[in-house]
C-alpha cells in the first residue's frame, strides 16, 4: 500500500527549524512519506511541492505568532491551483499574544484549514487524526471511482 504523503514546513518569515525536524521524524516514524520544505516556506512552495508529489496533505507550522497573516488565502490559492480538496493542517503558536485556542481554531477553520493543532497537542494524536482523515478521503475517492465505472 502507498504511504500517505505529507508536505511539511514552517511558513512565512518564521525560521524556527527544531520543531519542524521533530515533526519530520515523528511523521516518518508513523509511516508517512514526508516532503520537508524546511523553514521560511511560501504558500506557493507548499502548493508546488504538493502538486509535484501528489501529496495527500499540507502541514503548515508557525511558531513566531504570525501564522494568521501567513496562512491567509491559502485554501483559495490551493483551489486556484487545482488542489481544492487537499487536506490542510496547521499547528503551532499561530497568533501573537494570549488567545483562547477555541477562537484561534475557529479562525483557521474559517480560513479553510481542516484541522488546527495547538502547540501542546500530542503528536501521536496528530498522526492518528491525519491518518484517519487521509484514509477517509481515500475511501470516498475509491467509492466515487467505483460508482463512475
UniProtKB/Swiss-Prot annotation:
Keywords of this entry: Cobalamin, Cobalt, Isomerase, Metal-binding
CDD domains assigned: Glm_B12_BD
Record-listed E.C. numbers: 5.4.99.1
GO BP: any one term: glutamate catabolic process via L-citramalate
Broadest EC class assigned to this enzyme: isomerase
Domain B12-binding residue range list: 3-140
GO terms, molecular function: cobalamin binding; metal ion binding; methylaspartate mutase activity
Pathway the protein acts in: Amino-acid degradation; L-glutamate degradation via mesaconate pathway; acetate and pyruvate from L-glutamate: step 1/4
Cofactor (UniProt): adenosylcob(III)alamin
Reactions mediated catalytically: (2S,3S)-3-methyl-L-aspartate = L-glutamate
Ligand binding (adenosylcob(III)alamin): 13-17, 61-63, 93-97
Pfam families named in the record: B12-binding
Record InterPro entries: Cobalamin-bd, Cobalamin-bd_sf, GlmS
HAMAP family xref list: Me_Asp_mutase_S
Subunit structure: Heterotetramer composed of 2 epsilon subunits (GlmE) and 2 sigma subunits (GlmS). GlmE exists as a homodimer and GlmS as a monomer.
Biological role stated in the UniProt entry: Catalyzes the carbon skeleton rearrangement of L-glutamate to L-threo-3-methylaspartate ((2S,3S)-3-methylaspartate).
Family: Belongs to the methylaspartate mutase GlmS subunit family.
Protein name according to UniProt: Glutamate mutase sigma subunit
Gene encoding the protein: glmS
